[in-house]
């Protein structure tokens, strides 16, 4: 009985061993058909490439020589980088020392005179002059009398040179975009347009005409007449028609706060005009600086007279202006200094009178061409009236008539609107003061 039980237990153990042997085991993975993973990181960069074939042959020798060349190039590059590191650090250190010597902030001055290689006389914006030293790191080739230099704020030593020393005020005076006005926008003034073309446009576009005639073209013109007769408008049309550089300035801009800044601005204005020649310089309201000279104890009046003297020198000085034409405008020509408007400086004086009936009609036609007029509008009544209307007054009448129609929510301008606007414009012109905004 016991033997049977032991036999049965042995058979069960053998059966369990067979089950264990039959347990599934996955096959060993193979590398056939799979890409070998590339090692990454610094270890891969330092590892030399494998060279095949493994046997000794000439092909293996050539590959090893090529690897050697690459390693030598890498070694040379690393040594050069290591050698340049101290130089870069040295340059950075020297640059910081130069910045410390210059100091911050740096003031801007004008170089008046170079005494020797290490000393110069400079002037500041307040007008005072100083005998100062020139530091060794300043480029001496760029130093010349009249240039703008950087000064140390404590000892006023020259620590640098401004490469672009163009006055920002002169840069603003240069027109980047031509005005929209053309000769077609000017009513009448046919004679004035012809004269300014002969004096300004033709010498720049066709100088050979004057050479064949054996004459020198005019250097400049002055436009004078009552206010609102089209002087500035004609200058805008000239700027639109010509491709020359156009510089415009108002006479009051030449009057500066500090001593000597006004003449300096005039010199800078004409210097920029020469650099960008052919060019046209338009000076509006010239009576602000060009009035008759008289004895005065006021420092401001003497500064204005010095500015005018510099303007006289630029117009007809020792140096020729070249292809630089000057247009001046004023409504008080009787107050100008005779030396300013004499022949040789201003060769042509173009008068702008008040418009006659024919000119008034053309001006009204220009300003009403885009307006929607009612059938009862009769512009002849406004034109035939004996009122002293300038071109600006006619434009104001048309604008006021359009505003009256807009106020009453009408799309057409009537004859009554023109009558009321004319009365309003003439009343304001007579009184000289604008009407009250609130009634």
From Swiss-Prot:
GO terms for biological process: proteasome-mediated ubiquitin-dependent protein catabolic process. The keyword Magnesium does not apply. Keywords: ATP-binding, Cytoplasm, Nucleotide-binding, Nucleus, Proteasome. Gene3D superfamilies: 1.10.8.60, Nucleic acid-binding proteins, P-loop containing nucleotide triphosphate hydrolases. Its main location: cytoplasm. ATP binds at residues 225-232. SUPFAM superfamilies: P-loop containing nucleoside triphosphate hydrolases (SSF52540). Transmembrane segments: none annotated. One of its GO terms (molecular function) is ATP hydrolysis activity. InterPro entries: 26S_Proteasome_ATPase, AAA+_ATPase, AAA_lid_3, ATPase_AAA_core, ATPase_AAA_CS, NA-bd_OB-fold, P-loop_NTPase, Prot_ATP_ID_OB_2nd. SMART domains: AAA. PROSITE patterns: AAA. GO terms for cellular component: cytosol; nucleoplasm; proteasome regulatory particle; proteasome regulatory particle, base subcomplex. The keyword Nucleus applies. Residues 1-48, 82-104 are annotated as: Disordered. It is found in: Cytoplasm; Nucleus. Residues 12-25, 82-102 have a biased composition (Basic and acidic residues). Interacts with PSMD5. Belongs to the AAA ATPase family. This is 26S proteasome regulatory subunit 4. It comes from Drosophila melanogaster. The lineage of its organism: Eukaryota, Metazoa, Ecdysozoa, Arthropoda, Hexapoda.
